[in-house]
Amino acid sequence: MAKAASTLVFPIIFLVMFALIEQNMGCMAVLGSCGVITDCSGSCKTKFGQDASGDCDRDGGQGTCMCGYPCPHDKLHM
Protein backbone atom coordinates (compact mmCIF):
# COMPACT_ATOMS: atom_id res chain seq x y z
CA MET A 1 0.00 0.00 0.00
CA ALA A 2 2.83 2.42 0.81
CA LYS A 3 4.45 1.75 -2.56
CA ALA A 4 1.20 2.53 -4.40
CA ALA A 5 0.87 5.84 -2.57
CA SER A 6 4.46 6.82 -3.33
CA THR A 7 3.99 6.16 -7.05
CA LEU A 8 1.20 8.75 -7.09
CA VAL A 9 3.23 11.44 -5.35
CA PHE A 10 5.57 12.25 -8.25
CA PRO A 11 2.89 12.59 -10.95
CA ILE A 12 0.88 14.89 -8.68
CA ILE A 13 3.95 17.04 -7.97
CA PHE A 14 4.70 17.36 -11.70
CA LEU A 15 1.11 18.29 -12.53
CA VAL A 16 1.13 21.03 -9.91
CA MET A 17 4.52 22.32 -11.12
CA PHE A 18 3.40 22.52 -14.74
CA ALA A 19 0.16 24.26 -13.80
CA LEU A 20 2.10 26.92 -11.87
CA ILE A 21 4.71 27.37 -14.61
CA GLU A 22 2.05 27.89 -17.27
CA GLN A 23 0.39 30.63 -15.22
CA ASN A 24 3.67 32.52 -14.83
CA MET A 25 4.71 32.32 -18.48
CA GLY A 26 2.17 34.84 -19.73
CA CYS A 27 0.66 35.04 -23.19
CA MET A 28 2.22 35.42 -26.62
CA ALA A 29 1.00 36.93 -29.86
CA VAL A 30 2.37 37.44 -33.37
CA LEU A 31 1.85 40.93 -34.79
CA GLY A 32 3.25 40.37 -38.27
CA SER A 33 6.38 40.79 -40.36
CA CYS A 34 9.31 42.82 -39.03
CA GLY A 35 9.63 44.28 -42.52
CA VAL A 36 6.25 45.97 -42.06
CA ILE A 37 6.46 46.62 -38.29
CA THR A 38 9.65 48.64 -37.81
CA ASP A 39 9.37 49.01 -34.00
CA CYS A 40 8.26 45.62 -32.71
CA SER A 41 8.70 46.44 -29.00
CA GLY A 42 6.80 49.73 -29.29
CA SER A 43 3.97 48.10 -31.24
CA CYS A 44 3.60 45.40 -28.58
CA LYS A 45 3.48 47.99 -25.79
CA THR A 46 0.85 49.96 -27.70
CA LYS A 47 -1.33 46.92 -28.29
CA PHE A 48 -0.92 45.02 -24.98
CA GLY A 49 0.21 47.62 -22.42
CA GLN A 50 3.46 48.77 -20.83
CA ASP A 51 4.24 45.33 -19.37
CA ALA A 52 4.48 43.80 -22.85
CA SER A 53 7.76 43.02 -24.55
CA GLY A 54 8.43 42.51 -28.22
CA ASP A 55 11.23 41.00 -30.25
CA CYS A 56 11.81 40.31 -33.90
CA ASP A 57 12.26 36.56 -34.36
CA ARG A 58 14.60 36.34 -37.35
CA ASP A 59 13.83 32.73 -38.24
CA GLY A 60 13.86 33.48 -41.94
CA GLY A 61 13.07 36.26 -44.35
CA GLN A 62 12.38 39.58 -42.66
CA GLY A 63 11.41 37.95 -39.37
CA THR A 64 8.27 37.91 -37.26
CA CYS A 65 7.29 40.35 -34.52
CA MET A 66 6.57 38.30 -31.37
CA CYS A 67 4.93 39.85 -28.29
CA GLY A 68 4.96 38.56 -24.74
CA TYR A 69 2.50 40.06 -22.27
CA PRO A 70 0.72 39.18 -19.00
CA CYS A 71 -2.37 37.07 -19.60
CA PRO A 72 -5.72 38.61 -18.69
CA HIS A 73 -7.18 37.07 -15.53
CA ASP A 74 -10.27 35.82 -17.35
CA LYS A 75 -8.25 33.76 -19.86
CA LEU A 76 -8.31 30.03 -19.10
CA HIS A 77 -5.04 28.11 -18.78
CA MET A 78 -5.29 24.63 -20.23
From Swiss-Prot:
It comes from the Eukaryota. It is found in: Secreted. GO terms for cellular component: extracellular region. Belongs to the DEFL family. It comes from Arabidopsis thaliana. InterPro entries: LCR (IPR039641). The gene is LCR62. Residues 1-23 form the signal peptide. Disulfide bonds join C27-C71, C34-C56, C40-C65, C44-C67. One of its GO terms (biological process) is killing of cells of another organism. Its main location: secreted. Keywords: Antimicrobial, Disulfide bond, Fungicide, Plant defense, Secreted, Signal. This is Putative defensin-like protein 170.
